[in-house]
Amino acid sequence: MLTTMPFDTDDDHLKEECALFGIFNHPDAAALTVLGLHALQHRGQEASGIVTCNGQHFHAHRALGHVGDTFADPALMRTLKGSSAIGHNRYSTTGDTVLRNVQPLYFEFDFGGFALGHNGNLTNALQLRRQLIKRGSLFQSTTDTETVFHLMAMARGGSILDRIVEALRQVEGAYSFVCLAEGMMIGVRDPNGVRPLVLGKLGDSFVLASETCALDIIGAAYMRDIEAGELVVIDSSGVHSIRPFGTAEKRFCIFEYIYFARPDSRIENRSVYQARERIGAELAREAGVAADIVVPVPDSGVPAAIGYAAESGVPFGLGIIRNHYVGRTFIEPTDHIRNLGVKLKHNANASILAGKRVILVDDSIVRGTTSTKIVEMVRQAGATEVHMRISSPPTRHSCFYGIDTPEQEKLLAHRYSVEEMAKFIGADSLAFISIDGLYRAMGETARDPAHPQFCDACFTGDYPISLTDRDQRATQPELTLMFESRA
């Protein structure tokens, strides 16, 4: 009997994190949340969920799959009653891809129902989980997010806010949360502000979202970013801000600008698209090469390639065409089929590549498998030279703050020098933007090792938040990413 399993046709990029969306006080809350999640689909494709509240009762639907599949049934949408809603798109960084891990999670407390969606990773979740189990907690999922609910249940404070604050003071890691309770919606960012969260307004309604592109799709006006370490409460009287977690050095994830965020979003008052163009221009200044055409690896490489071409004077061309309708493919995953998998997503445009010296621009190299196939594809299309330029520094370290990265030993840049990597992928030359060049593109003079303005741990190994579970040699990989020898 033939068993078919899904494989990812693009397994050589860092995987997106999760998406958050919430709206308070709108008659079409569920429908608008679906639209917001559509705009944020790039941040998580494994599962999607929505929880609504009509003031007293909560309604929920969660399922594995894309937003369009999960919420396609009009009859289902009519069951999601209420004027407030929160939604979540999931790409798992902790816990299996099963329905019980799909967010927003929902629990009943003595004060009423409470739903929560999480983007990020709690780096002491396994330690806390073990402590809570010893105290009698019964966990229903394998995601780190559930830890917050049990900490709230154990909290001594009486109000919802008291319990949330007491719970979050015990967790470590990178997180943005959007929560829904009776009569209120809550947004929180961790003290280092690693993961994004923005606040918007639609008429008399307030909106929370991971990115501004989700505000745009529903016509909401951007108000501001939720600040690092800030907790906002949205209720019938408006938006209230508190800062209960003390101060910490802000370290927003720089990879949001390189790859994760949608290019039409603005994060921390910066245009993502313009940041990528500037990165490409800086890359051209640092690593120019004689060539006939600059070609992006679509879609993530396009803005950087435009910036590279403009700075270098080498013409830009769409030498690789992407098929946007292919992702995980359910066919027999033989080696031959896997080798063809990249062609399901990318195909060389031989009409503009033949006889050309080509500069390929991509955002990153993780394992090197996709880069190898794309270089080969471009050569087969008739390119006489292939030079690879990467709009991020070499990824030498794993991320423990909400990005699904391979263990360190599987990262190509951890194992090889740049020259060895060029040989591995079959390129005539390979260059990455320097870490100082990346910071220059972001408006800084250089990276200040004593006080970096971003989290760049995947490049530098400088982790701004404790890796408690990893450091204690955690041995249950299904519960946490905090150890590097997981299967």
Predicted regions and their residues:
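Conserved short alpha-helical segments that host acidic/polar catalytic motifs at enzyme active sites
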Residues: 1-228, 233-291, 297, 385, ...
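Active-site proximal loops enriched in glycine and acidic residues that flank catalytic Cys/His/Asp
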Residues: 179, 189, 210, 236, ...
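PRPP-dependent phosphoribosyltransferase catalytic core
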Residues: 168, 183-184, 201, 219-225, ...
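Short, glycine/charge-rich flexible loops or terminal/linker lids adjacent to PRPP-binding catalytic cores
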Residues: 313-358, 369, 396-406
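Phosphate/diphosphate-binding loops
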Residues: 166, 214, 221-222, 226-230, ...
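Amphipathic alpha-helical
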Residues: 147-159, 298, 310-328
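Flexible loop/turn segments at secondary-structure boundaries
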Residues: 28-30, 93-94, 124, 194-195, ...
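A conserved beta-strand->alpha-helix junction
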Residues: 141, 146, 316-327, 424-442
